[in-house]
């Protein structure tokens, strides 16, 4: 069995495809990860561990120790490479592309091999990547995530303390500080969604309709914000690790 792990900036998700076991821990509870996995599966049956980590080198070092389960398991960290048979990266310096974005694109390409794709990840940052029907990454956009943007505003507003910002489907003028912030941030992201639509509409004529795929912790708001049908998949990075494993066999 193979263990797949997605270590993000706030949470760590894991998945064992062969038995469909999965779970999530807070990144600050990293010491609990191995124990949680061992409580659900028979770790003696694990043959390999594949990891996506965007949380920094120190977390990567901790993960390598935790996920070896004291069995000298090969813990392999995904690194961006290009070209691959299904995806060619647009970045001139490919190592500067976030491995999570790359893996998400691999997963989407596997699912929609003949369609133009827009991949939106609404996490601590909101990223959008565009991939042609031929598997050519055209580039993308990065803006602060919903909660990241909210924290930046709260830090300069001493009379407002909110743990989590909830966006609105359609913005209108706010009537207090909190409401003004959520209305304003909602309007900003509405503009982002409109630009994604415009870019897709302005691209070359296609035989199949484009695929818009949304993932990340704040995916629900973005799902309803698009006027076109959207595919929601909260596990794109984990699925991308599985695709990468197959490509490298």
UniProtKB/Swiss-Prot annotation:
It catalyses: (R)-pantothenate + ATP = (R)-4'-phosphopantothenate + ADP + H(+). Substrate binds at residues 77, 98-101, 177. Pathway: Cofactor biosynthesis; coenzyme A biosynthesis; CoA from (R)-pantothenate: step 1/5. Pfam families: Pan_kinase (PF03309). Its cofactor is NH4(+); K(+). The active site is at 100 (proton acceptor). InterPro entries: ATPase_NBD, Type_III_PanK. Its EC number is 2.7.1.33. SUPFAM superfamilies: Actin-like ATPase domain (SSF53067). ATP binds at residues 6-13, 124. Its main location: cytoplasm. One of its GO terms (biological process) is coenzyme A biosynthetic process. One of its GO terms (molecular function) is metal ion binding. Keywords: ATP-binding, Coenzyme A biosynthesis, Cytoplasm, Kinase, Metal-binding, Nucleotide-binding, Potassium, Transferase. Transmembrane segments: none annotated. It is an enzyme of class 2 (transferase). It is found in: Cytoplasm. One of its GO terms (cellular component) is cytoplasm. A monovalent cation. Ammonium or potassium. K(+) binds at residue 121. It comes from the Bacteria. Homodimer. Belongs to the type III pantothenate kinase family. HAMAP family: Pantothen_kinase_3 (MF_01274). Catalyzes the phosphorylation of pantothenate (Pan), the first step in CoA biosynthesis. This is Type III pantothenate kinase. The lineage of its organism: Bacteria, Pseudomonadati, Pseudomonadota, Gammaproteobacteria, Cellvibrionales. The gene is coaX.
């Amino acid at each position: 069995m193979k263990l797949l792990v997605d270590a993000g900036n706030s949470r760590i998700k894991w998945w064992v495809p062969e038995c469909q076991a999965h779970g999530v821990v807070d990144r600050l509870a990293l010491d609990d990860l191995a124990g949680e996995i061992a409580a659900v599966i028979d770790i003696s049956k694990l043959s390999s561990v594949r990891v996506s980590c965007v949380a920094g080198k120190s977390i990567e070092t901790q993960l390598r120790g935790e996920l070896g389960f004291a069995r000298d398991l090969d813990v392999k960290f995904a690194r961006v490479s290009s070209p691959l048979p299904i995806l060619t990266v647009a970045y001139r310096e490919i190592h500067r592309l976030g491995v999570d974005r790359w893996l998400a694109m691999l997963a989407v390409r596997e699912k929609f091999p003949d369609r133009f794709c827009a991949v939106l990840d609404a996490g601590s940052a909101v990223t959008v990547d565009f991939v042609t029907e031929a598997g050519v990454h055209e580039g993308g956009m990065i803006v602060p995530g919903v909660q990241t943007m909210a924290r930046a505003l709260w830090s300069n507003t001493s009379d407002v303390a909110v743990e989590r910002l909830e966006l609105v489907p359609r913005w209108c003028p706010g009537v207090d500080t909190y409401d003004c912030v959520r209305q304003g941030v909602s309007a900003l992201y509405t503009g982002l969604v409109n630009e994604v639509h415009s870019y897709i509409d302005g691209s070359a004529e296609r035989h199949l309709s484009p695929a818009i795929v949304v993932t990340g912790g704040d995916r629900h708001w973005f799902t309803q914000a698009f006027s076109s049908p959207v595919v929601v998949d909260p596990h794109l990075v984990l699925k991308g690790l599985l695709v990468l494993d197959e490509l490298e066999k």
